[in-house]
Regions:
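Outer-membrane beta-barrel proteins
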Residues: 1-342
């Protein structure tokens, strides 16, 4: 029988009681990204997005990390979006417990479910980036995130396969984090779970499940909802490929088009030194209900990125057909971007 082996097993010194931190390290990092984009739609609502222009966004990330007397670690992350009004765009606190895993409080974003909404390889951005009309194939992980608590297992190895998983509870699904000592008005809870299997050959298989118990009190969600996703990725040398599917079951949306939806995403990327090129496709399907036929929206994108030290130059040519479920409606964008990490 194979023994289960712990990867990176760390000894926990002293009592398990939580006590004061010995030392804290503070760091700040950031990114500046400027882009020029053209956009063109041929019919209907897409014409409102036609045009061209320059844009710049600046993101700052602050982290603090310390170790407790018993060997546990505490990490805090806060991301700040400075593109417009100063906004806290990401914030999490993580208690690392060595071989016991970690507990994370997702104040703003940061859930493991949301992190696997689209894992297909790309050189610049997800295939649907800049093409979405309000819905896109990466809907998985959107129900439970901010204001949630999550357990993340340590990584284990069994028969040469790395195994890890997460469990999340959100007491106010879809509403975001509460103010300090605040409570949610609806108290509609949700749960999420993810699993990931990795192998030294470069193969990775994973998936997740997300649900809202009773969403009748959530604005924009009219019933209990389940979401599920699964993906396969394989990397060998400079080549990486990925395939992912997702499905949303809106249990009480009988007679309503758009109640259930499904998505498929495919990507392939090749890296030669500092240059990466990729091609991706995705399809978002609003499932048929009764006599109403299903509608499809297709996305595709060709991308390239070249890195020179802290600078990355990226380009993307992207298109979607069937915008909003209308087969004759198309929308396309061309993007040239340069970013600096510091």
């Amino acid at each position: 029988m194979n023994n289960i082996k712990k990867i990176g097993l760390s000894a926990l010194a002293g009592s398990l009681a939580m006590v004061s931190a010995n030392a804290v390290d503070y760091t700040m990092s950031g990114e500046i990204a400027s882009s020029f984009q053209t956009a063109k739609g041929d019919t209907g609502s897409t014409e409102a997005s036609n045009g061209k222009g320059f844009g710049t966004e600046t993101d700052l990330t602050f982290t603090a990390a310390g170790e407790l007397d018993n060997g546990f670690t505490v990490d805090m992350l806060m991301g700040v979006d400075t593109a417009g009004a100063l906004t806290n765009s990401s914030s999490q606190v993580t208690l690392g417990m060595g071989s016991l895993g970690a507990l994370r409080l997702n104040h703003i974003g940061g859930s493991s479910a949301n992190a696997i909404d689209d894992v297909t390889p790309n050189a610049y951005q997800e295939v649907w980036d800049g093409l979405s009309d309000g819905s896109n194939p990466s809907f998985f992980g959107s129900l439970n995130s901010s204001g949630s608590i999550e357990y993340r297992s340590a990584a284990y190895e069994y028969a040469g396969v790395g195994i890890s998983g997460t469990l999340l509870y959100d007491p106010n699904s879809g509403l975001g984090a509460n103010a300090p000592r605040g409570v949610g008005a609806t108290s509609v809870s949700g749960q999420s779970a993810t699993i990931k299997l990795t192998h030294a050959s470069g193969l990775e298989v994973g998936g997740g499940l997300e649900e809202v118990d009773d969403a009748s009190g959530i604005v924009g969600i009219t019933s209990a909802t389940n979401q599920v996703t699964g993906y396969v990725k394989y990397a060998v040398g400079p080549l990486s490929i990925g395939y992912q599917e997702a499905y949303e079951d809106n249990k009480a949306a009988t007679g309503t088009v758009g109640g259930d939806q499904s998505a498929t995403m495919t990507g392939i990327a090749y890296t030669a030194g500092d240059l990466t090129v990729s091609y991706g496709e995705a399809t978002l399907t609003q499932e048929a209900i009764g006599a109403t036929a299903a509608t499809e929206e297709d996305f595709d994108s060709i991308q390239a990125a070249y890195t020179i030290g802290a600078m990355t130059i990226s380009a993307a040519v992207s298109e979607t057909t069937g915008v909003g479920g209308v087969a004759a409606q198309t929308f396309e964008t061309n993007t040239l971007a340069v970013s600096f990490a510091f």
